[in-house]
Amino acid sequence: MANNSELIKQCEMVAKEWLSPSFDEQTRKEVQAMLDNPDKTDLIDAFYQNLEFGTGGLRGIMGAGTNRMNKYIVGMATQGFANYINKAFPGKQCAVVVGHDCRNNGRMFAETVADIFSANGIKVYLFESLRPTPEISFAIRQLGCQAGVNVTASHNPREYNGYKAYWDDGAQVLAPHDKGIIDEVNKVKIEDVKFEGNKDLIIPIGGEMDWDYIQAVKEAMVDQDVILRQKDLNIVYSPMHGTGRVIIPMALRSWGFQNIHVVPEQMVIDGNFPTVVSPNPENAEAMTLGMKLGTKLNADLVIASDPDADRLAIVCRNPKGEWEILNGNQTCMMFSWYIIANKKKLGQLKGNEFLVKTIVTTEVIAEIAKKNNVEYMDCYTGFKWIANEIRINEGKKKYIGGGEESFGFLPFDKVRDKDSPASICLICEIAAWARDNGKTLYDLLMDIYAEYGFSKEVTINVVRPGKTGADEIKQMMTNFRENPPKELGGSKICLWKDYQTLEAKKADGTVEKINMPATSNVLQWFCEDGTKVSVRPSGTEPKIKFYTEVKDPSFKCAGCYERCTKAAEDKIAAIKKSLNLE
C-alpha cells in the first residue's frame, strides 16, 4: 500500500486541507502526525475515500480523516442531509428527530447534528439522553417528522461510531433519497457547514415519548392470557452497557412480566463495553455474565439487547439443563412460527397478512409461511428493505413480522427498524406459552424443525481491512461472476442468482429475471439438496460474507438434533473447502 505513490499523493492532498483553521487543533495535530509518518498506511486508510451510506448509513472508526467518524464528517453529512431535506420539502417547516446510543462521542455528535439542522431552519426533536434505535424510528412517525438521525454503530467494536439517516416513514433512507443525500453531502465543503445552532428550534424529548413507545410495543402482543398465567416467568436481561436499560425492563413489566432480573455489571452505560470483547449478540462470549446470573437464579431464559437495542440475543436451556444460545435464524423461525400459529388459533388471521425475510435468512421461514397459507416476501439485507415492503403494502396487506439472520426482528408496524424491546417482550411471551404447554423454548425449536425441516446456517466472514482489502473483496466477487462454482461441498448447483444483473440462471441454461426493487452486489447459489450459499460484501465493515444453509431431511425429533447438526457442520466445512475459504 505504501508504495502506491499516486494514491499517497492524492491522500496527502486531501489531508493537507484538514490542516486549515476550519479544523480544531487536536484534529490538525492528528493529521500532521499521519503526514509526517514515513509509513503512510494510516494516512491512506484515513483519507483514501469518503465514508459512504451502506446498508446502515455512515459507519467508521472514530478519528481524523475523510474515512473516519468525527464531528467534521458528521457535520458535512448533516449539512448535506439538511440541504436535501429542505429541497425535498420546499416551503415547509421541516422537523427531524435526533438520537444517539451509548458510544463514545455519541452525545457530542448528536448535539452537533442538532445544531446544524437547526442552523438550517429545521426543527429538531433531540432526545435528552441515549435511546434505543427503534424508539427513534417510532418518534419520527409519532411526531410527523420529515427525517431523523441516529448516532450509533450498533454492535460494532468500541472504536466505531456511526450515523443512520431516516426518512419520514421512520425507515432508513432508500433510493432515490440515499443517492440524493450523498450527492448533496459530496457538494459540501467544511466552510459550508453551519455549526452554530439555533437553540429556539431544538426541542428536548424523553419520558413522554418513552411512554408512547412502550404503549405501542404492546401491539406486538399475541396472547395476553398466557402472560397472565405465566407472569412469574424467570427472566434475566442485559442491555450490554447500552440503551436497552432505559426501556426494556419497563416494557417487560408493561406486558405483565413480574420476575425480571438484570445483569448489574452490564446495566452500567459505557461506550468502552468493559465486560465484553465485542458488544455483539452474535458472539457467545458477550452472553457469559447473563448465563452466569441465569444459572444462579435458575432462570427460564436469558435475553440481551445490543448497545442501540435494535438486535437481541436469546439463551434457553436444553434437555441437559445447559444454556443454548439461539442463532438469528432460529430466532426468526421461532417468531414467525409463533405469530402465525397463535394468531391462527386465536382467529386473528384475516387472510391478508404477510411476513418478510431477507434473502440470506433461512428458507425454513418460507416453509412455515407456505404451509400456513401466509404470504412471505424476500428482500435484500438491511432492515430498510423490510421497511420498504411494509411501505409498499401499507393499506393493502397486514404486516405481522419480519426479520434477518443477524438477530433482528420487527413484530409490528409502528416502527420501521429492527426492534429489540418489542422482540424481547414477544420472545418472553413465547417462552411463557411454551411453559404453559409444558415445554421450553428449546423444545419448541425442535418441534419447528420436525414439522418444517431441519436446517443449519453458518455465516463465514472473510475480513479484508483497508484499501487493499476493499480491492481484494471486489476481485473475489468478479472471480465468482466470471467463474461461478458448479458444486458446493459435493452438492450440484441447480440455480445461480446474480442480484447485480437481476438474473437467475438454471442448470438447463434458461435465464429468468429476478423481481427486486433495485440491484445489489449479491450472488446466490442453490443446490438440488436444499443447500444455499449467499455471497455479499458487507455494507458497513471491511469483510465479505458467505451465508451458508444446509438441510437434513432425516430430522424427525429432538433426539436427531446433535447428529443432524454434526452432519451439517461437516457439509459446511466441505463447502468452505470447495470455495477455498479455509
What are these regions (language model features)?
Residues A2, E6-V113, I202-I235, T243:
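An N-terminal, well-structured beta->alpha segment
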Residues V97-Y160, Q258-I314:
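N-terminal small/polar loop signature for handling phosphorylated ligands or for N-terminal nucleophile
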Residues R107-T112, S137-R141, E159-A165, K194, ...:
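Short acidic, glycine/serine/threonine-rich loops at helix termini
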Residues Y166-K194, N329-N352, K357-E367, S420:
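Glycine-rich phosphate-binding loop plus the immediately following alpha-helix
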Residues W18-S22, Q26, D42-L51, N161-T288, ...:
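Gly/Ser/Thr-enriched, mixed-charge loops and adjacent short helices
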